[in-house]
Amino acid sequence: MNLIQQLEQEEIARLTQNKTIPAFAPGDTVIVQVKVKEGTRERLQAYEGVVIAKRNRGLNSNFIVRKISSGEGVERTFQTYSPLVDSIEVKRRGDVRRAKLYYLRERSGKSARIKEKLNYKAPAAKKA
């Protein structure tokens, strides 16, 4: 392991020492609690939607969550190890055959539904 990878691993360990990141995949419905600063106040905002893409790149890992808000599709990219992401909760496991679900952007209504994965055996959540 080279020096940069070692430093990234140490930074990931530091950022995740008091929170756990569950194992989730594209197709899963997640609730992401995001820290939002409004003036002097800081509060948590829940963002619930379907994970349409996940990018595993160490410290630069991110994932895209898509939801329908007021009939309009909204996508938001979250950095997995960002201090602004307070927690990630998997609400429902989706059964999909693709790693990137960008085709959901063109679909709406019943054609955009994702089948639920039954009897899912989750790998252990990452605890650094």
UniProtKB/Swiss-Prot annotation:
UniProt GO molecular function: structural constituent of ribosome
Keyword Ligase: no
InterPro entries to which the protein is assigned, alphabetical: Ribosomal_bL19, Ribosomal_bL19_CS, Ribosomal_bL19_sf, Translation_prot_SH3-like_sf
Any GO BP: translation
Entry-linked SUPFAM superfamilies: Translation proteins SH3-like domain
Family membership: Belongs to the bacterial ribosomal protein bL19 family.
Domain of life per record: Bacteria
Name of the protein in its database record: Large ribosomal subunit protein bL19
